[in-house]
């Protein structure tokens, strides 16, 4: 598809599609719902709307968002959930029993993901690959201890979810402009992977 620059642009353009699909990850976090991109509210009734393995990231919807959640869920033609908690939320607001499905990362085996990965090693020497979404000091301390024991370099993708200034001091390398194929390469070739991420764990 072409590149869409804003909500109005994508809203006008989606008439040319037979279906619009959203899915995986915590796209329906309370903080994401207000943007109306992942809710598919920009898609007209004439276009099919599909949600695959989408996660709410919470067990309950905040009271203030219940009306909005009920509205957008009932507009989506085909719903599925990644977690049991999401399945229950959908049932509560739509009355529908939806299937529990695998995250898309689990739909391919390692050989298929390997075909997508950047072919040549990005980091030549032995390394510990860190992919942290949270800001937990004990995780960083653990990585530093692992470095002492293994003498591996620390390679980390920094500032993924928030700016963490202290992270810049404990890493040896912090590649930027990492593509999905590069990410797979960094995971595949690491001696160790340290992560607090669902997808970091799955790909490891």
Regions found by a protein language model. Give the residues of each.
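Aromatic- and Gly/Pro-rich donor/ligand-binding loops
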Residues: 1-71
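Nucleotide-sugar donor-binding and catalytic loop/hinge architecture
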Residues: 15-17, 43-46, 113-127
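An anion/phosphate-binding loop that grips the pyrophosphate of nucleotide cofactors and donors
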Residues: 17, 76, 190
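Catalytic donor nucleotide-activated moiety binding site of glycosyltransferases and closely related
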Residues: 53-58, 90, 139-179
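Acidic anion/phosphate-binding donor-loop and adjacent secondary structure
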Residues: 58-64, 106-120
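A conserved, positively charged/aromatic
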Residues: 70-74, 187
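A short beta-strand/loop micro-motif in the catalytic core of glycosyltransferases
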Residues: 76-83, 194
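Donor nucleotide-activated moiety binding/catalytic core segment of transferases
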Residues: 98-106, 110, 162, 166-196
């Amino acid at each position: 598809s072409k590149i869409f620059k804003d909500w109005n642009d994508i809203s006008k353009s989606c008439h040319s599609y037979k279906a619009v699909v959203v899915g995986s990850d915590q796209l329906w976090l309370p903080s994401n719902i207000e943007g109306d991109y992942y809710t598919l509210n920009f898609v007209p009734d004439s276009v099919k709307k599909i949600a695959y393995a989408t996660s709410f990231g919470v067990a309950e919807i905040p009271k203030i968002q219940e009306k909005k959640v009920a509205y957008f869920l009932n507009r989506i033609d085909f719903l599925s959930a990644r977690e049991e908690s999401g399945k229950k939320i959908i049932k509560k607001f739509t009355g529908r029993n939806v299937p529990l499905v695998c995250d898309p990362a689990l739909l391919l085996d390692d050989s298929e993901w390997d075909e997508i990965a950047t072919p040549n090693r990005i980091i030549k020497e032995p390394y510990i690959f860190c992919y942290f979404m949270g800001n937990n000091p004990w995780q960083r301390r653990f990585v530093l201890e692992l470095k002492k024991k293994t003498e591996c370099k620390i390679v980390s993708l920094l500032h993924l979810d928030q700016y963490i200034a202290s992270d810049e001091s404990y890493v040896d390398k912090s590649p930027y402009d990492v593509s999905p194929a590069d990410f797979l390469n960094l995971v595949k070739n690491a001696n160790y992977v340290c992560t607090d991420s669902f997808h970091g764990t799955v790909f490891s």
